[in-house]
Amino acid sequence: MEVILLEKVGKLGTVGDVVDVKAGFGRNYLLPSGKAITATKASIADFETRRAELEAAAAEKKTSAEGRAKLIDNLGAITIGANAGDEGKLFGSVGARDIANAITAAGVNVTKAEVKLPEGTLREVGEYEIDLQLHVDVTHVVKVVIVADANA
């Protein structure tokens, strides 16, 4: 299935690329999420008339993500209190949603989908370097400190 990308998609292409993808990936992910349209002669012609508009929108999204990364830098370390035992083990865990909520509470909007935890949830008190994928091209590292909280 050939599609025209309407925005940059990681490991696939950039705005305007005509790429061949598996039918399921195209129908179930790219088309419903608005990241691509099917490549027909009419859609290619329509895309060429909208190309500048789409590229400007993509550049604006990237600039916005870079701005959010600078704001997150200004926050410094994010501290999250969690109920923990004497040895530093948490009763429960700190996940992507908790980290996103803590950053949002500090003043910068971050969704849980933007928080990348490749090794799973955090289960011990300590300092962690967490990747935030704010845009396809913008990855930012934030320091998260988990402390034992007597009130949690």
Curated annotation (Swiss-Prot):
PROSITE patterns in the record: RIBOSOMAL_L9
Assigned GO CC terms: ribonucleoprotein complex; ribosome
Keywords: Ribonucleoprotein, Ribosomal protein, RNA-binding, rRNA-binding
Tree of life domain: Bacteria
Family, per entry: Belongs to the bacterial ribosomal protein bL9 family.
NCBIfam families: L9 (TIGR00158)
Annotated function: Binds to the 23S rRNA.
Listed name of the protein: Large ribosomal subunit protein bL9
Natural source organism: Saccharophagus degradans (strain 2-40 / ATCC 43961 / DSM 17024)
